[in-house]
Regions:
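C-terminal catalytic subdomain
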Residues: 105-214
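Accessory "access/gating" subregions that flank catalytic or transport cores
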Residues: 2-123
Length: 214
């Protein structure tokens, strides 16, 4: 892609000190240290396209969303979420407390946020795929194909990735904002956490193929 490390500079990261953004830029600098490609194309462009120079600013929030979801789910997995819950009393008896620890909004919102983060991550990946295959910006053979008279090169991979991105956009719609009244209006609010978790699982599955395509 003939990019530059200018946008990954420590000074740029320091004035917007989100830890995951800083770490992402540091990772990119470390991976590309002493790269002959970087040296060869130094000054090739005034600045890179957003899908290249904004990687820390997108990958950082995605990492944060994953960490936040992990922290939330760790609490959920070590919680008592039944209803009612039975507690011992000091007199040796027990009491049943009716509550709503069974509500799945924590897991649901975490899962919905994951869907959005995954979709954003793959959105940028798809943009880079296009830059790799588009000869007008890559300065490489169209669709990375030297024999255009005989086949379409990697065009079909981009089609597949774009189709998967469309599915991710659908899955990025938050499940927890939906509601249906049930149980004779006793359960007049339903958190839809299961649907959100299922969407997150499906999104991760689709994302693997998009990132592999890139």
């Amino acid at each position: 892609l003939k990019g530059t490390l200018m946008a990954m500079a420590e000074r740029l990261m320091a004035v917007r000190p989100h830890p995951d953004q800083i770490n992402t830029a540091a990772n990119i600098r470390a991976i590309l240290k002493d790269s002959p490609m970087l040296e060869r194309y130094r000054g090739h462009r005034v600045q890179d396209a957003l899908s290249i120079r904004c990687m820390p600013q997108l990958h950082g929030p995605v990492k944060k969303a994953v960490k936040d979801a992990q922290a939330t789910l760790a609490i959920e997995l070590n919680s008592s979420v039944d209803n009612p819950l039975i507690f011992d009393e000091e007199d040796g008896g027990a009491v049943a407390l009716m509550g709503c620890n069974a509500d799945g909004t924590y897991a649901g919102m975490a899962s919905d946020n994951l869907c959005i983060a995954i979709t954003d991550l793959c959105k940028m990946s798809n943009s880079r795929i296009d830059r790799l295959l588009n000869s007008l910006v890559s300065e490489l053979p169209a669709f990375l194909n030297k024999n255009a008279d005989f086949n379409n090169g990697l065009m079909m991979i981009q089609y597949a990735s774009a189709g998967l991105q469309g599915e991710l956009r659908i899955l990025a719609h938050p499940a927890v904002v939906d509601n249906l009244t049930t149980c004779a209006n006793q359960e007049d609010y339903v958190n839809m956490g299961y649907n959100a978790a299922k969407k997150a699982y499906d999104s991760m599955h689709l994302a693997k193929y998009i990132l592999a395509a890139e």
